[in-house]
């Protein structure tokens, strides 16, 4: 009789999870950062807030961003004036946009990743979809399955409200799925549309302005799998180790709340400080078991934020 351990071993991949393909997509509407403050304060009827606009201009100038892509055009915003106000009830209007646009943008990125992968989409065994832009049921994972024409029995995982660490979260999950399911090919999609967070400026909520200066719309897709098929699949990266941690004294540093006015967010000024105080400990936990002390000798990723966090 075959033992349980032998069955479990046969069900698992032999090698580490690898990223086999990458695809990205953005809305057609491109916004130049240098002129965005003029547009933003005009479309939100806030041009009388001269000092606040000057502050926002400085934020944009220091952002190290030259351009962004946004689903929200001038025409869309004029048709939905409640979205342009600071805290006007507008969730219905926002939801109507994102429940359609989020999976559509995700499809664009996924199609590119599948094409680069070079295998038929029928070989996709798992789907992970992650977004902070809107919540619906059935979710964006279901909508993407239909848009791509995936098999109905693809194993789906829908993740909402992960915020800035969405990318790291889906990579961690994809690695576990690929390594513990022999032959698994995981389609991973993150798609964000800032229609859910866009709002007019407020003198009392400057951290909202930081988001208006930094955030853009886009989607990214990966194919993740272990034991690449020789001469057909071409792995780009191997994922050796993933983890997640809660930094001490970080509660309230980054908050998001879904309200009638959309998704509101709050950022403390000390977020870069919290990251810098705790990054060394996280690196030691990651690399010490592997016998690595020179962090610059290998490729690793910490969650990237604005320039203050990266610095």
Curated annotation (Swiss-Prot):
UniProt-listed SUPFAM superfamilies: Thiolase-like (SSF53901)
Pathway where this protein functions: Secondary metabolite biosynthesis; flavonoid biosynthesis
E.C. code: 2.3.1.74
GO-annotated biological processes: flavonoid biosynthetic process; polyketide biosynthetic process
Protein's UniProt keywords contain rRNA-binding: no
Keyword terms, alphabetized: Acyltransferase, Flavonoid biosynthesis, Transferase
Highest taxon, organism lineage: Eukaryota
Pfam families: Chal_sti_synt_C, Chal_sti_synt_N
GO molecular function, one term: naringenin-chalcone synthase activity
Keyword tRNA-binding applies: no
InterPro entries (alphabetical): Chalcone/stilbene_synt_C, Chalcone/stilbene_synt_N, Chalcone/stilbene_synthase_AS, Polyketide_synthase_type-III, Thiolase-like
Catalytic activity: (E)-4-coumaroyl-CoA + 3 malonyl-CoA + 3 H(+) = 2',4,4',6'-tetrahydroxychalcone + 3 CO2 + 4 CoA
CDD domains named among the record's database cross-references: CHS_like (cd00831)
Active site: residue positions: 164
Known role: The primary product of this enzyme is 4,2',4',6'-tetrahydroxychalcone (also termed naringenin-chalcone or chalcone) which can under specific conditions spontaneously isomerize into naringenin.
Family assignment from sequence similarity: Belongs to the thiolase-like superfamily. Chalcone/stilbene synthases family.
PANTHER family to which the protein is assigned, alphabetical: CHALCONE SYNTHASE 7 (PTHR11877:SF62), HYDROXYMETHYLGLUTARYL-COA SYNTHASE (PTHR11877)
The protein's name in its UniProt record: Chalcone synthase 4
Name of the gene this protein is made from: CHS4
């Amino acid at each position: 009789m075959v033992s349980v351990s032998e069955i479990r071993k046969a069900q698992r991949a032999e090698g580490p999870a690898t990223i086999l393909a990458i695809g990205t997509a953005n809305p057609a509407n491109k916004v130049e950062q240098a002129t965005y403050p003029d547009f933003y304060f005009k479309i939100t009827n806030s041009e009388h807030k001269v000092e606040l606009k000057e502050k926002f201009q400085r934020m944009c100038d220091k952002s190290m961003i030259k351009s962004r892509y946004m689903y929200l055009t001038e025409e869309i915003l004029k048709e939905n004036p409640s979205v342009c106000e600071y805290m006007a009830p507008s969730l219905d209007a926002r939801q109507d946009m994102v429940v359609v646009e989020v999976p559509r943008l995700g499809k664009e990125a996924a199609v590119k990743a599948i094409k680069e992968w070079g295998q038929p989409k029928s070989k996709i065994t798992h789907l992970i979809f992650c977004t902070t832009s809107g919540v619906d049921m059935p979710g964006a994972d279901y909508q993407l399955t239909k848009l791509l024409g995936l098999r109905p029995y693809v194993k789906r995982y829908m993740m909402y409200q992960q915020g800035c660490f969405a990318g790291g979260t889906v990579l961690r999950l994809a690695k576990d799925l690929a390594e513990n399911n022999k032959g698994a090919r995981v389609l991973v999609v993150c798609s964000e549309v800032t229609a859910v967070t866009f709002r007019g400026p407020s003198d009392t909520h400057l951290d909202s302005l930081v988001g208006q200066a930094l955030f853009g719309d886009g989607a990214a897709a990966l194919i993740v799998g272990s034991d690449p098929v020789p001469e057909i699949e071409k792995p780009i990266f191997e994922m050796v180790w993933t983890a997640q941690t809660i930094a001490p004294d970080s509660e309230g540093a980054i908050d998001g709340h879904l309200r009638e006015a959309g998704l509101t967010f709050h950022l403390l000024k000390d977020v870069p400080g919290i990251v810098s105080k705790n990054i060394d400990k996280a690196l030691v936990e990651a690399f010490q078991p592997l016998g690595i002390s020179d962090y610059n000798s290998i490729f690793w990723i910490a969650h990237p934020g604005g320039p203050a966090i990266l610095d």
